[in-house]
Regions:
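A short hydrophobic/aromatic micro-motif that marks alpha-helical segments and, especially, helix-coil
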Residues: 83-84, 148, 167, 186
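Acidic/proline-rich low-complexity IDRs
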Residues: 6, 16-20, 33, 37, ...
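Extracellular repeat turn/loop positions enriched in glycine and acidic/polar residues, especially those
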Residues: 121, 130, 149, 168, ...
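Short, surface-exposed interaction patches in beta-rich subdomains
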Residues: 158-160, 164-169, 173-268
Length: 268
């Protein structure tokens, strides 16, 4: 695909995304205003409630699907779920904890939040998170298989350890401050992505419209397969102008560029 074709493709994608967000936002705001006027919701009546104090059975997997609620993951002595919203429900399916909010949380006028506490010594088999308009913050995540599907809100993860990692970012910013991430498949949307962590195994990153900053350990650990787009690609202070292989490390990262810049730096 030529540079001109790439430009047309990404401009069309960006225009489509902006138009879609504008239409959806207008519809949601309009419906929300009607419902709030009809039900006259009083946010002060909502108090934090523990929807499950403890889970007697072993929880190996957690599946979270939130349309508009914020998600906060914290360290705790046991698996615990809290929410300030009546729209948030949970159930246990075998060894899987499932958490979901209803679509009405988009229009009920509340700032809905879910807090999930996970012991620091617990490594989950699977963690699936699908989040829409809300933000996500996590102190620590330790999991074999991670699947993140993010929407308009920002995401910050202080420490991430994962063996198999699939992340789709949306319009919000995405930040990982530390950790060890293996076999990463990352698709970046519109927002800015910053990852400060080791990335191990065979990984693939598609920047699309958003920008990417990687802060990695020693450069000798990595091989980069660069498919340059319209944005700049800078690896260890050297700008890459063409598609090429950079480095000869054991860990491979395929970088597919788009409109946004890609900047890779290393610990000195």
């Amino acid at each position: 695909m030529s540079s001109t074709q790439k430009l047309i493709k990404y401009v069309a994608v960006l225009f489509g995304l902006l138009l879609s967000f504008s239409i959806i936002f207008s519809i949601v705001e309009g419906i929300g205003g009607i419902f709030r006027a009809l039900i006259n919701t009083d946010n002060s009546t909502f108090e934090t409630r523990v929807i499950s104090e403890d889970f007697n059975d072993t929880i190996n997997d957690i599946d979270i699907d939130l349309s508009s609620s914020n998600l906060i993951i914290k360290k705790g002595d046991k698996v615990l779920v809290e929410s300030n919203s009546k729209s948030v429900k949970y159930k246990i399916d075998g060894t899987t904890l499932k958490i979901k909010d209803s679509k009405s949380s988009l229009i009920n006028g509340t700032d809905s939040s879910v807090i999930v506490y996970i012991p620091d010594d617990v490594k989950l088999d699977k963690l699936n998170i699908d989040i829409g308009a809300g933000y996500l913050t996590a102190e620590s995540v330790n999991v074999k298989k991670l699947d993140l599907n993010l929407g308009a809100g920002s995401t910050t993860i202080d420490n991430l350890i994962s063996d198999d990692t699939d992340i789709d970012t949306g319009a919000g910013s995405f930040t990982i401050n530390s950790g060890s991430i293996s076999n990463l498949d990352l698709d970046i949307g519109v927002g800015r992505t910053v990852i400060t962590a080791g990335i191990n195994g065979n990984s693939s990153i598609d920047t699309g419209i958003g920008s990417l900053t990687l802060n990695l350990p020693n450069s000798g650990f990595y091989t980069f397969d660069v498919d340059k787009g319209l944005g700049r690609v800078i690896i260890n202070d050297d700008e890459i102008f063409n598609d090429k292989i950079v480095g000869d490390g054991i860990n491979t990262i395929k970088l597919s560029g788009g409109i946004g810049d890609i900047i890779v730096s290393f610990d000195k």
